[in-house]
C-alpha cells in the first residue's frame, strides 16, 4: 500500500464538528506545490476537518512516484483509508483539479460527497492534440531534469496561463518553488501530462455527486473553458490562475457556500 504524505487539521474547537466525525475536506495542490499551499484556505474553512495532501514527487512525498492517473487515484484512496476518512469533499487546483476529477469519475471514491475544482483542465479531445501536448511536456520535463531549477521556473511562470502575474509575483513564486526536486517534478509532469489524461467531460457530466468549478476572474483560459463546456462556474475577484493563493478569503467563502448549499440538497436535486 502506498500512502501519500499529508497533514491533518482538526476543526475549530467551537465547531459542532469538533466532537463528531463528519465529512472531511481533502485538498490536492498543483504542480510544483505542496499541501501547505492550501493551509490559508483550509484554516478559513475550519468548521470542517481538513487533509492537506502532498502529491507524488512533491513536498514530503518527493520520494514517491506515480504511473499515471489511475495509480495516483489508487494512492489517494489508500491514503484516505489509512487516515480513517470515510466521507469527504475533494478539492483540487490545476494538476490537483485534474486528479480530483479523474478520481471522482473513475477511481474508488466511496464516501465522496462532492467535488471542487479550481482551474483544472478536462483534457484534450483528439489524439493529435494529446500527442502535441506530450511532446511539449516532455521538453519541460527534460529541462526540469537537467537545468538549474530557478532558471526553468523563470520560464515556466512566463507561460500565458500566468499572464496576470506581475514581475514581483513571478519572482516570489520562483523563490517559493525553488525548493522542489527537479527530477521528481519532471517524472510527475510526464506521468500526468494532458497527453495521457482521458477526456473527462462526459464522465464529469454523469457524476451523481455535486460539483463546482472555481476560477479567478483574470484566468481567461479557464474562464473560457468553463463557459464553453457549461460548467457550474464561480469566479474569484482579483485573481488569476491561482485564485486560492491570490484571494484565500473569497475562495474559502465560495467553498463554504457550496458545501452549505450542496449539503441541503436532496439526492434528486444534485443538478450541476
Curated annotation (Swiss-Prot):
Coiled coil ranges: none
Function: Catalyzes a proton abstraction reaction that results in 2,5-elimination of pyruvate from 2-succinyl-5-enolpyruvyl-6-hydroxy-3-cyclohexene-1-carboxylate (SEPHCHC) and the formation of 2-succinyl-6-hydroxy-2,4-cyclohexadiene-1-carboxylate (SHCHC).
Known EC number: 4.2.99.20
Entry keyword set: Lyase, Menaquinone biosynthesis
Any GO molecular function: 2-succinyl-6-hydroxy-2,4-cyclohexadiene-1-carboxylate synthase activity
Keyword Transcription regulation carried by entry: no
Family, as annotated: Belongs to the AB hydrolase superfamily. MenH family.
Listed name of the protein: 2-succinyl-6-hydroxy-2,4-cyclohexadiene-1-carboxylate synthase
Species lineage: Bacteria, Pseudomonadati, Pseudomonadota, Gammaproteobacteria, Enterobacterales
Annotated metabolic or biological route of this protein: Quinol/quinone metabolism; 1,4-dihydroxy-2-naphthoate biosynthesis; 1,4-dihydroxy-2-naphthoate from chorismate: step 3/7; Quinol/quinone metabolism; menaquinone biosynthesis
Catalytic activity: 5-enolpyruvoyl-6-hydroxy-2-succinyl-cyclohex-3-ene-1-carboxylate = (1R,6R)-6-hydroxy-2-succinyl-cyclohexa-2,4-diene-1-carboxylate + pyruvate
Enzyme class: lyase
Origin: domain of life: Bacteria
UniProt cross-references to Pfam families, sorted A to Z: Abhydrolase_6
Subunit structure: Monomer.
Record InterPro entries: AB_hydrolase_1, AB_hydrolase_fold, SHCHC_synthase_MenH
Species this protein is from: Yersinia pseudotuberculosis serotype IB (strain PB1/+)
GO BP terms: menaquinone biosynthetic process
Amino acid at each position: 500500500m502506498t500512502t501519500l504524505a499529508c497533514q491533518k487539521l482538526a476543526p475549530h474547537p467551537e465547531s459542532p464538528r469538533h466532537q463528531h466525525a463528519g465529512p472531511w475536506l481533502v485538498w490536492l495542490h498543483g504542480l510544483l506545490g505542496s499541501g501547505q499551499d492550501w493551509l490559508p484556505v483550509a484554516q478559513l474553512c475550519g468548521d470542517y476537518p481538513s487533509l492537506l495532501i502532498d502529491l507524488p514527487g512533491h513536498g514530503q512525498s518527493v520520494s514517491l512516484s506515480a504511473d499515471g492517473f489511475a495509480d495516483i487515484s489508487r494512492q489517494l484512496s489508500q491514503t484516505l483509508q489509512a487516515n480513517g476518512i470515510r466521507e469527504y469533499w475533494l478539492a483540487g487546483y490545476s494538476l490537483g483539479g485534474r486528479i480530483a476529477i479523474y478520481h471522482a469519475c473513475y477511481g474508488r471514491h466511496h464516501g465522496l460527497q462532492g467535488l471542487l475544482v479550481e482551474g483544472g483542465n478536462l483534457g484534450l479531445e483528439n489524439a493529435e492534440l494529446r500527442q502535441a501536448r506530450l511532446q511539449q511536456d516532455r521538453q519541460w520535463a527534460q529541462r526540469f531534469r537537467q537545468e538549474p531549477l530557478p532558471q526553468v521556473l523563470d520560464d515556466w511562470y512566463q507561460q500565458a496561463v500566468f499572464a496576470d502575474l506581475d514581475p514581483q509575483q513571478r519572482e516570489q513564486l520562483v523563490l517559493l518553488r525553488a525548493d522542489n526536486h527537479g527530477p521528481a517534478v519532471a517524472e510527475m509532469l510526464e506521468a500526468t501530462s494532458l497527453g495521457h489524461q482521458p477526456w473527462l467531460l462526459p464522465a464529469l457530466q454523469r457524476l451523481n455527486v455535486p460539483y463546482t468549478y472555481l476560477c479567478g476572474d483574470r484566468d481567461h483560459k479557464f474562464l473560457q473553458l468553463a463557459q464553453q463546456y457549461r460548467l457550474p462556474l464561480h469566479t474569484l475577484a482579483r485573481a488569476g490562475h491561482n485564485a486560492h493563493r491570490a484571494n484565500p478569503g473569497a475562495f474559502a467563502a465560495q467553498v463554504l457556500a457550496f458545501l452549505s448549499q450542496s449539503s441541503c440538497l436532496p439526492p434528486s436535486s444534485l443538478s450541476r
